[in-house]
């Protein structure tokens, strides 16, 4: 930690990633690195990929004396059959407008932010509703509406995502499943990622896959090696 004290910590989705920096190259090692040195304050924990990881995160935080708020226990969010988005915590219920970012997985990120903003900053409900319609999130299912790439894409819809681990491939795949148009995937990755597992998420979901090189990046996997 670079701070002696903090107001709060938000823990996002933890999954297999950045093993090259870890001595324990497993999900347990990732969880340890992300939770073992958190300062004592307030910790808000997002929904995890599965219950097993969620339990491991909770166990890893047992010795931390912070106030802890877990998705599914202390706050929750869901989309009803009539598409209403409902948020709940011990302060009360909120019916939320549709966010201006793509992907239902973002509802979990939004819920963690709402929990923190209500508990720590006492943000008003109307400001929360306004805020989730004005989110600026770069490189996460971000629709590109202008610029050089959009000119190349023409009338096609262009969406970019910088996801590079298995959990992000699940997220992208789930979003693709919700689309009514054919999806063509263009992919470039670094050498140290789980390429086969990442790509397996898109089997049977996309119209085509195009592998490209990452320009001026020594750590990128070449398109020829990727295809093999």
Language-model region placement:
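Flexible, gly/pro- and Lys/Arg-enriched active-site loops
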Residues: 15, 19-24, 148, 213-226
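Alpha-helix N-cap/helix-start motif
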Residues: 23, 54, 109, 169, ...
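Nucleotide phosphate-binding/pyrophosphate-handling subdomain across enzymes
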Residues: 1-10, 15-18, 92-208
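A short acidic, often aromatic-flanked loop/helix-cap motif at beta-alpha or helix-coil junctions
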Residues: 74-80, 149-151, 217-219
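A general structural detector for well-ordered alpha-helical segments in enzyme core domains, enriched
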Residues: 33, 172, 198, 225-226
């Amino acid at each position: 930690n670079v701070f002696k004290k903090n107001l709060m910590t938000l823990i996002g989705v933890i999954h297999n990633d950045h093993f090259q920096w870890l001595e324990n190259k497993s999900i347990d090692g990732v969880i340890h690195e992300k939770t073992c040195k958190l300062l004592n304050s307030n910790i808000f924990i997002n929904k995890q990929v599965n219950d097993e990881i969620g339990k491991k995160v909770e166990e890893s935080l047992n010795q931390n004396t912070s106030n802890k708020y877990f998705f599914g226990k202390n706050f929750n969010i869901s989309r009803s059959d009539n598409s209403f988005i409902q948020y709940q915590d011990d302060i009360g219920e909120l019916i939320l407008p549709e966010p201006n970012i793509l992907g239902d997985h973002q509802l979990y990120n939004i819920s963690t932010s709402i929990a923190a903003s209500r508990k720590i900053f006492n943000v008003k409900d109307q400001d929360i509703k306004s805020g989730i319609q004005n989110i600026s999130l770069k490189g996460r299912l971000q629709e590109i509406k202008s610029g050089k790439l959009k000119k190349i894409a023409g009338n096609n819809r262009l969406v970019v995502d910088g996801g590079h681990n298995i959990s992000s491939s699940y997220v992208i795949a789930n979003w693709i499943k919700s689309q009514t148009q054919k999806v063509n995937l263009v992919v470039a990755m670094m050498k140290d990622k789980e390429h086969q597992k990442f790509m397996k998420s898109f089997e049977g979901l996309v119209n085509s896959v195009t592998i490209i090189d990452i320009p001026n990046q020594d750590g990128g996997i070449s398109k020829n090696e990727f295809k093999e």
